[in-house]
């Protein structure tokens, strides 16, 4: 059955037109769903009984089931179950009046980065648009209890957003548009490992969302060791596509850089990064490595973390040191799901 959360308003208008209904009914339906969070069409009381019944028969209104919520200070992590029994996770980070939701886009991930728990799973499947939107509905329902709203969305959970392009783009429209979640494009960030052709495609979508690129190394030799796809999409070409995106959208690009001890946190790595980004519309997020048992990498020493940051800052690079709020409750990429499956006796 078609899940209504996969549809944009124009598509619903067309369907309703075919049913002989006026187009404003679509606005009423979306108002119930996205503003009042009503997911039972029978409760949409300003619609005729016939239309309510028809909606019930034609569409599914299902959202993912919450299996477990873990919380630690500012971070809440939701382990969700999809209709086919697969698990995904969504993270809510509440900080300084902001409620940022980190959504997943795939069950597992095909990229296989050598520092990521999700990379160990491999790709099981892409999420449908409604499964991405459903994650936001679950969290908005939870936030509603304290009369708060989602303010920011980051595509930074399980999976590579640009490897599930069509569903991700559609979900961004639903999140962004007034008839949907009505969250402005500057509050939406898509984080990618760097699938170059899709970055160019994204630049042409006129979405003007923020783009973050997981760089994690300042030369191809190092980057290819932890991000296999770098062999196909090397750093120079990746940066070219990123700066094209910046030029097209007027938004500087964020480069995520996970600092790993004695691997990419040395003085020469910082200097090399400066050479790549100096004078460019770029911002660097430094993230000290969040240890995953399955990988040998160690967390950088504090003095090396601060030295790295200082070299960038002193060279005029915009840089932020980000402490991962999720790390204490295993909110890093894919870790809660991995733990859950382990407890269920499944292998990942
Ligand atoms: S870091 Fe991102 S792209 Fe790489 S394996 Fe993990 S989820 Fe996939």
Curated annotation (Swiss-Prot):
Residues the entry annotates as binding [4Fe-4S] cluster: 109, 113, 116
Main location per the UniProt record: cytoplasm
PROSITE patterns the UniProt entry points to: RADICAL_SAM
Residue pairs linked by disulfide bridges in the UniProt entry: 102-333
Localization (cell): Cytoplasm
Keyword Secreted: no
UniProt-listed Gene3D superfamilies: 1.10.150.530, Aldolase class I (3.20.20.70)
Positions that bind S-adenosyl-L-methionine: 159-160, 191, 214-216, 290
Alphabetized CDD domains for the sequence: Radical_SAM
GO terms, biological process: rRNA base methylation; tRNA methylation
Protein name as annotated: Probable dual-specificity RNA methyltransferase RlmN
Species the sequence originates in: Dictyoglomus turgidum (strain DSM 6724 / Z-1310)
Organism lineage: Bacteria, Pseudomonadati, Dictyoglomota, Dictyoglomia, Dictyoglomales
